[in-house]
Curated annotation (Swiss-Prot):
This is Malate dehydrogenase. The active site is at 175 (proton acceptor). Signal peptide: none annotated. It comes from Chloroflexus aurantiacus (strain ATCC 29366 / DSM 635 / J-10-fl). Keywords: NAD, Oxidoreductase, Tricarboxylic acid cycle.
Length: 309
């Protein structure tokens, strides 16, 4: 029996995620949105590409949550877009209501699903989704670190003049300007990145990574990134559905790891069929821990705002 993936939100990120997933033939796809005609039109358009691109999965669009029943993975991309000059925290009031509505309707219909959150502020919305769904925390995760690490790897490859395929990089922390790229855990085909890039340039790359989402928002003027976020989301879905045991940074629920409790936070995990199968604790130095704690403080402040609504 084919796997089933439901994507809630048929905007740029949602529909592009559907395209990546269809191309990978990971399962039948349901694209849901509250705007009548939009998910149906995008799903039909994508399905009509299947004879050309050669993927054999069904893609359907709907406004009815009943059509998402018995999903193996639920991806939530619904949310207000981020505008120039707007912080992720500005989005919290609007997107909290959207998240509650989506999860309260979708989760009961797919009690065994893994939920992947993609809306902002990411860490707080993932916490809210876990609370509303009542699912085990390991089956509710947030997509942030895979995207942020991809940006980091891209910038390293550009600077070093090497293939992006050979760059491995890790980062941690909240999804936002306080994320913590980790040059000490970044390599090019196993060679420390410091052998290729001078410390001052590496520091600039770290800062560009932190501002990566905002850079694209400022360039586009009327929207935000969607190709890379969708590709990152599809990679996480693939890790779950194929039980790949991928090591990747995701927003996971912490119960004492890194000295943090009752918070969704970007950390390296082993991702498989059960969602987060293990949280990996890296031996961070004093400077890295200070940055991590500062990031956690920012995430906690957003979470406190959420809880006060």
């Amino acid at each position: 029996m084919r796997k089933k993936i439901s994507i809630i939100g048929a905007g740029f990120v949602g529909s592009t995620t559907a395209h990546w997933l269809a191309a990978k033939e990971l399962g039948d796809i349901v694209l849901l949105d509250f705007v009548e005609g939009v998910p149906q039109g995008k799903a039909l358009d994508l399905y009509e590409a299947s004879p050309i691109e050669g993927f054999d999965v069904r893609v359907t669009g709907t406004n009815n949550y009943a059509d998402t029943a018995n999903s193996d993975v639920i991806v939530v991309t619904s949310g207000a877009p981020r505008k120039p000059g707007m912080s992720r925290e500005d989005l919290i009031k609007v997107n909290a209501d959207i998240t509650r509505a989506c999860i309260s309707q979708a989760a009961p219909l797919s009690p065994n699903a893994v939920i992947i959150m993609v809306n902002n502020p990411l860490d707080a919305m993932t916490y809210l989704a876990a609370e509303v769904s009542g699912f085990p925390k390991e089956r509710v995760i947030g997509q942030a670190g895979v995207l942020d690490a991809a940006r980091y790897r891209t910038f390293i490859a550009m600077e070093a003049g090497v293939s992006v395929e050979d760059v491995q990089a890790m980062l941690m922390g909240g999804h936002g300007d306080e994320m913590v790229p980790l040059p000490r855990f970044s390599t090019i085909s196993g060679i420390p990145v410091s052998e290729f890039i001078a410390p001052d340039r590496l520091a600039q790359i770290v800062e560009r990574t932190r501002k990566g989402g905002g850079e694209i928002v400022n360039l586009l003027k009327t929207g935000s990134a969607y190709y890379a976020p969708a590709a990152a989301t599809a990679q996480m879905v693939e890790a779950v559905l194929k039980d790949k045991k991928r090591v990747m940074p995701v927003a996971a629920y912490l119960t004492g790891q890194y000295g943090l409790n009752d918070i969704y936070f970007g950390v390296p995990v082993i991702l498989g069929a059960g969602g987060v199968e293990k949280i990996l604790e890296l031996p961070l130095n004093e400077e890295e821990m200070a940055l991590l704690n500062a990031s956690a403080k920012a995430v906690r402040a957003t979470l406190d705002t959420l809880k006060s609504l």
